[in-house]
């Protein structure tokens, strides 16, 4: 394949990925020999296409190629952990996690990676909850706050689930995970108890304001 043909294929691939037509993009991906490509962005996109089509071994192969071309590769290592978990290759997932931790010792996302490994291994809920609680102490984000609330629900910790939903709803106000939190909270309030009192909500707000990231945000405001 000459340079002009490769460029044409790459433009087609970019267009298909932008439209989220991953099935069509797969046909383009399989028509190109990616071993000569040096662009980490392009290799990452190719891995995205394979992953979207559940072709995890191929995605992993491309990510390893990208890792070989990268000076640090923190983001690539993160994805290698995720893909290895999806392949249920937990030994390799742990190896990649250890490499990630070595180059990103202070990156809070290491808690999420470890959680994803435990979740894939179907580890006890208490272990999964503990990791997400550690992450929440450092980062308060919608997706993982809801994930933690859902784990509390699965573990039968009803009050903790409701409190976690309240924090998420009060802080973020709207969005996909706020809606999910409202639905999860309502399930318990309909079945087990009346609505939370204003006093409970005030206490939840006070706990939120004590969170380091939220406190910093409030000071900046």
Each PLM stretch: what is its role?
Residues 7, 40-41, 74-75, 109, ...:
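Start-of-helix register in tetratricopeptide repeats
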Residues 25, 59, 93, 127-128, ...:
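Single-residue signature of alpha-solenoid repeat helices
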Residues 19, 53, 87, 121-122, ...:
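Structural motif corresponding to the intra-repeat A-B loop/turn of tetratricopeptide repeats
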Residues 11, 45, 79, 113, ...:
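"A position-specific structural signal for the A-helix of alpha-solenoid helical repeats
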């Amino acid at each position: 394949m000459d340079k002009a043909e490769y460029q044409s294929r790459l433009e087609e691939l970019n267009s298909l990925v932008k439209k989220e037509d991953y099935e069509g993009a797969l046909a383009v991906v399989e028509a190109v020999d990616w071993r000569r490509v040096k662009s980490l962005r392009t290799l990452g996109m190719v891995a995205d296409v394979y992953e979207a089509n559940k072709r995890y071994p191929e995605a992993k192969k491309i990510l390893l190629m990208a890792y070989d071309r990268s000076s640090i590769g923190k983001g690539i290592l993160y994805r290698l952990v995720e893909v290895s978990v999806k392949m249920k290759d937990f030994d390799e997932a742990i190896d990649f996690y250890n490499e990630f931790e070595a180059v990103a010792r202070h990156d809070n996302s290491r808690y999420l990676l470890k959680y994803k490994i435990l979740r894939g291994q179907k580890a006890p809920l208490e272990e999964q909850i503990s990791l997400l609680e550690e992450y929440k102490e450092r980062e308060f984000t919608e997706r993982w706050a809801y994930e933690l609330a859902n784990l509390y629900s699965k573990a039968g910790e009803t009050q903790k689930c409701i409190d976690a939903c309240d924090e998420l709803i009060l802080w973020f106000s709207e969005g996909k995970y706020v809606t999910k939190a409202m639905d999860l909270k309502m399930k318990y309030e309909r079945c087990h108890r009346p609505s939370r009192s204003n006093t409970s909500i005030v206490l939840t707000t006070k706990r939120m304001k004590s969170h380091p990231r939220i406190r910093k945000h409030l000071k900046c405001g």
